[in-house]
Amino acid sequence: MTRVEQRLAAVNVTVALVALFGGVVTGLFQALEYAGVEIYPALAPIVRSHYHSVSIHGVLNALVFTTFFICGFVPFMLSRSLQAPLASARLGWLTFWVMAGGLVLASIPLVGNAATVMFTFYPPLKAHWAFYIGLTLVVVGTWLVTLNLVLTWRAWRARNPDRRTPLAAFMALVTFAMWTIASLGLAAEMLVLLIPWSLGLVSGTDALLARTLFWFTGHPIVYFWLLPAYISWYTLVPRQAGGKLFSDPMARTSFILFLILSTPIGIHHQYTDPGIHQGWKLLHALLTFAVFFPSLLTFFNVTASLETAGRARGARGWISWFGKLPWTDPSVAAQVLAMVLFAFGGVGGLINASFNVNMVVHNTAYIVGHLHLTIGTAVTLTFMGITYWLVPHLAGRALFSRTIALVQVWLWFGGMLIFSPTLHELGLRGMPRRTDIGHISYMQPQWKTLLPLVGIGGAILFLSAVLYFLNMVLTVAVSRRAPQPVPEFAEAVSGPDHAPAFVDRWKPWLALAAILIAIAYGPTLIRLAITTPLTTPGLRVW
């Protein structure tokens, strides 16, 4: 690995953390509004409404923070795993500037209240054309990352024809292969429907076709967020905790299943949409339950790996190994606590996928609570844990304060234990999501008793974030000690040689993924494309 990979990781992670800061601040505004604190009049004209705040929060956290962090961290891991530089430094820098340019272009209308369409940007809500083109450029940048990773791997393979691809590199390639396939839906929505519509080249669009193309990408993007966290959980955390990965072949199998199953499941977000046959909705429901299986493999494999670490540190009982983990290491503590809360988020996701039970929670605050257990904890807290070693390494300076880091990690865990279950309960009591709750005329008594807890949980999360950013800034600007060594990759109890050779072949898995997508999406997309008139005009509500 050269300084180029480190600099590319540094600039991408920097943009990601700046975006996270903006998303956290706007998240506090929404939590306070839930608690009955009228804050938006004091923020005008910077933040003009609840929906302006939600749009900024969603785009910065769910799209910008995650994408830039992943595009910094995953190539870093692949390069380090292969012990080889990226194939093209120029391509790496071109990628960053394409993405950064797209971010600036999209941010101008977003901040200016000309793209208050939330991070799903469903039509007929209409944003400024710069918002759509900017986000499209960010997606194009991720494709360039995929190209660089593949070129790097092929160069490594030419030098090592008989070696099994190292696990971290294998997972990095699967992550971006899955995302490149899945992002084609979003690209089609942007290029065919939204950009021409926003530029005035066509008079209308269609909400159902746009939503279907969005969810072609919109659910797989969850795995684009999660799989980099899994890379750390599988390849680094067992070693950081003092143990070994339980099974390398099982880890590879889980990622292959994610590659095959992550995309043909998006219609489970559209159970209530007319115009899609119930049979296709049922197929997507079954496939959504199927994609839960590789997460179960991950749960078993990572838990077994942590148990080996706890027992290596002296534990003897069935449960006591958990207490023997190195809880004084903020990187480990953050990621293990992220795993704990994600277990509940994963199980809760089965309710969203269920063909009938989904009707109880659909478009309620339950979904907000679920999303904050997945991206808000499993992803965000894991990425925070990663930065506790990655930022010191990139800056060449030791983490400023492990104590502050540990306090931050536990505050995030505690705040989310208040914030997310309360939103789940509010959803079960019928409170809608994506609604300006502070100004509704139909407030229910059973909601009023719980809403202050959302504000309390959100305030604790914000305090945790303040400590996190303070620690990051002081690490870069003030710390003078040398950093700790970068965590080594974990050895495996059952190593890569125990996996069949065909696991390392790409064509069968990519072909199977394409066939399954064609079956699950082909008939619906073809029918909608042929029969749907593009007549829906644009609306700007806020």
Enumerate the predicted regions with their spans.
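Generic start-of-chain signal for non-secretory N-termini
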Residues: 1-11
